[in-house]
Amino acid sequence: MTIVRKTHPIMKMVNHAFIDLPAPSNISGWWNFGSLLGLCLIIQIASGLFLAMHYTPDTLTAFSSVTHICRDVNYGWLIRYMHANGASLFFICLYLHIGRGIYYGSYSYMETWNIGILLLFRTMATAFMGYVLPWGQMSFWGATVITNLLSAIPYIGTDLVEWIWGGFSVDKATLNRFFAFHFILPFIIAAMAMVHLLFLHETGSNNPLGIPSDCDKIPFHPYYTTKDFLGIVLLLAFFFTLVLFFPDLLGDPDNYSPANPLSTPPHIKPEWYFLFAYAILRSIPNKMGGVIALILSILILALFPHIQTGKQRSLMFRPISQFLFWLLVSDVLVLTWIGGQPVEPPFIIIGQIASVLYFTFILAFLPIAGLNENKMLKW
């Protein structure tokens, strides 16, 4: 008797990707975040679809339509908070996934890594546009400040900003187009995630030791489906604790006030998951320089495969690089904290030092540490 999953054209693809996929026998819980990101994307698309049924992308009614969802729609408050906190959960998993890739040297798979960086940019763009939609104070001013950064581009900057706005300020046209893009981008992200998986399955997964594992592979099901299921249960437990008990913990209180172009909030800041990049942007006094630093803070991830100097792929047996990696993680946390603080001493100088260290760790300290470890191991 032929097994359907091995012969049916569609089932065969699913089988090769999730059932009979040969996987290294020693991958740890840090490899769970790929499947958790898939779950987060499903939660976001599903909750977003239901929100879009009741939301109106119009400056006069956007804020009240969100209020209507929370007050009048059956379980609307739950759907709204699932979507808002789902974004935070998405970025938590995303940053842990990237951190694991850096720690264990997964950036050696160039195509997979580069598509991952494009996915990160797409996700950040989607989250930013989604943050504008409730049309609260921070939504409006966040959109104004961040889109205005494009005016730093020589010659075409001002025209480009007005083209994106659809007028001379953030208004109805801006909200409408942001809603359209926010709706379509998650489906593009889902398609790109499939390509990300396709390239990953061409090379096979990395493992904590960073060594070839072709001699010791096990089927993905039942071993890693069970392991992923445990990760999903833990993630959902954390997620619903956040949604049901602390729904506004990661939000901004200013967004409970309707957008008012005549009143500027005392401190404009994006959502918490962009604060590290926002701190780097603010730490450079020049507008153009700040925008370049902001883009490079993410784009620098693409350099990892090219500046890897260690003969060992993983940091598991490289104590100096391990120490520097955790200093880099601490530095990103400091930048996140600084991004949420007002622009005044001592936060300005702390942000500038942390920004310089961020680039120095990646471009200088980690490659030098790799060379030193090679010498210590007589390689």
Curated annotation (Swiss-Prot):
<dbReference type="GO" id="GO:0006122">
    <property type="term" value="P:mitochondrial electron transport, ubiquinol to cytochrome c"/>
</dbReference>
<dbReference type="GO" id="GO:0005743">
    <property type="term" value="C:mitochondrial inner membrane"/>
</dbReference>
<feature type="transmembrane region" description="Helical">
    <location>
        <begin position="347"/>
        <end position="367"/>
    </location>
</feature>
<feature type="binding site" description="axial binding residue">
    <location>
        <position position="97"/>
    </location>
    <ligand>
        <name>heme b b566</name>
    </ligand>
</feature>
<comment type="function">
    <text>Component of the ubiquinol-cytochrome c reductase complex (complex III or cytochrome b-c1 complex) that is part of the mitochondrial respiratory chain. The b-c1 complex mediates electron transfer from ubiquinol to cytochrome c. Contributes to the generation of a proton gradient across the mitochondrial membrane that is then used for ATP synthesis.</text>
</comment>
<dbReference type="InterPro" id="IPR005797">
    <property type="entry name" value="Cyt_b/b6_N"/>
</dbReference>
<dbReference type="GO" id="GO:0046872">
    <property type="term" value="F:metal ion binding"/>
</dbReference>
<feature type="transmembrane region" description="Helical">
    <location>
        <begin position="288"/>
        <end position="308"/>
    </location>
</feature>
<dbReference type="InterPro" id="IPR016174">
    <property type="entry name" value="Di-haem_cyt_TM"/>
</dbReference>
<dbReference type="InterPro" id="IPR027387">
    <property type="entry name" value="Cytb/b6-like_sf"/>
</dbReference>
<feature type="transmembrane region" description="Helical">
    <location>
        <begin position="178"/>
        <end position="198"/>
    </location>
</feature>
<feature type="transmembrane region" description="Helical">
    <location>
        <begin position="77"/>
        <end position="98"/>
    </location>
</feature>
<keyword id="KW-0813">Transport</keyword>
<dbReference type="GO" id="GO:0045275">
    <property type="term" value="C:respiratory chain complex III"/>
</dbReference>
<keyword id="KW-0472">Membrane</keyword>
<feature type="binding site" description="axial binding residue">
    <location>
        <position position="182"/>
    </location>
    <ligand>
        <name>heme b b562</name>
    </ligand>
</feature>
<keyword id="KW-0408">Iron</keyword>
<keyword id="KW-0812">Transmembrane</keyword>
<keyword id="KW-0830">Ubiquinone</keyword>
<feature type="transmembrane region" description="Helical">
    <location>
        <begin position="113"/>
        <end position="133"/>
    </location>
</feature>
<keyword id="KW-0679">Respiratory chain</keyword>
<dbReference type="InterPro" id="IPR048260">
    <property type="entry name" value="Cytochrome_b_C_euk/bac"/>
</dbReference>
<feature type="transmembrane region" description="Helical">
    <location>
        <begin position="320"/>
        <end position="340"/>
    </location>
</feature>
<keyword id="KW-0479">Metal-binding</keyword>
<keyword id="KW-0349">Heme</keyword>
<dbReference type="InterPro" id="IPR030689">
    <property type="entry name" value="Cytochrome_b"/>
</dbReference>
<feature type="transmembrane region" description="Helical">
    <location>
        <begin position="33"/>
        <end position="53"/>
    </location>
</feature>
<protein>
    <recommendedName>
        <fullName>Cytochrome b</fullName>
    </recommendedName>
</protein>
<keyword id="KW-0999">Mitochondrion inner membrane</keyword>
<comment type="similarity">
    <text>Belongs to the cytochrome b family.</text>
</comment>
<feature type="transmembrane region" description="Helical">
    <location>
        <begin position="226"/>
        <end position="246"/>
    </location>
</feature>
<dbReference type="Pfam" id="PF00032">
    <property type="entry name" value="Cytochrom_B_C"/>
</dbReference>
<dbReference type="InterPro" id="IPR036150">
    <property type="entry name" value="Cyt_b/b6_C_sf"/>
</dbReference>
<feature type="binding site">
    <location>
        <position position="201"/>
    </location>
    <ligand>
        <name>a ubiquinone</name>
    </ligand>
</feature>
<dbReference type="InterPro" id="IPR005798">
    <property type="entry name" value="Cyt_b/b6_C"/>
</dbReference>
<keyword id="KW-0496">Mitochondrion</keyword>
<feature type="binding site" description="axial binding residue">
    <location>
        <position position="196"/>
    </location>
    <ligand>
        <name>heme b b566</name>
    </ligand>
</feature>
<comment type="subunit">
    <text>The cytochrome bc1 complex contains 11 subunits: 3 respiratory subunits (MT-CYB, CYC1 and UQCRFS1), 2 core proteins (UQCRC1 and UQCRC2) and 6 low-molecular weight proteins (UQCRH/QCR6, UQCRB/QCR7, UQCRQ/QCR8, UQCR10/QCR9, UQCR11/QCR10 and a cleavage product of UQCRFS1). This cytochrome bc1 complex then forms a dimer.</text>
</comment>
<keyword id="KW-1133">Transmembrane helix</keyword>
<keyword id="KW-0249">Electron transport</keyword>
<feature type="binding site" description="axial binding residue">
    <location>
        <position position="83"/>
    </location>
    <ligand>
        <name>heme b b562</name>
    </ligand>
</feature>
<dbReference type="Pfam" id="PF00033">
    <property type="entry name" value="Cytochrome_B"/>
</dbReference>
